[in-house]
């Protein structure tokens, strides 16, 4: 027969063992929760980094779009300034600026509203006057729709060489995009630095 004292200690040890098992199980549960939390936290950090990168990419694209828009607006302003400058020069002395290229340097007069503009008087010397060379600067007096849609207009004011260059350079562009590209090309290649400087000075006024 077990003595009361021994029974007491056995019960106590048994209770301690059970409590230890409970503590061990609690610790295991806590470790599982910790592991799960760490995985969730790492996933959150990864998603946060991805989101931050996407935001940065969007910001970069926005800044690039803003820069491109400013470039287009600047180029368009320059082209409009060129048209205004040409009109002002024509109003002052009736003569447009000569083109930069030597092959198309001589200016061709603008079409006259006179219905008899196809008839020309022979020179006093009796010799046939030389046909004026085409001058692309005269093309700046016309609208974009005329530029794009009128084949006669292009043939009248642009040399075959210039037409071929435009068709080759901008074959993959259409509509307003092509009109802008062609206008910008003409501005950059057919106007001298002095002419561009004059236009920019007039735009500042």
Swiss-Prot record:
Q: Name one GO cellular component term.
A: host cell cytoplasm
GO terms in the biological process aspect are: symbiont-mediated activation of host autophagy
Q: Which controlled-vocabulary keywords does the entry list?
A: Activation of host autophagy by virus, Coiled coil, Early protein, Host cytoplasm, Host-virus interaction
Instruction: Kindly list the cysteine pairs connected by disulfide bridges.
Output: none
Sequence ranges of Polar residues compositional bias: 111-141
Q: What induces it?
A: Expressed in the early phase of the viral replicative cycle.
**Name recorded for this polypeptide:** Uncharacterized protein K205R
The species is: African swine fever virus (strain Badajoz 1971 Vero-adapted)
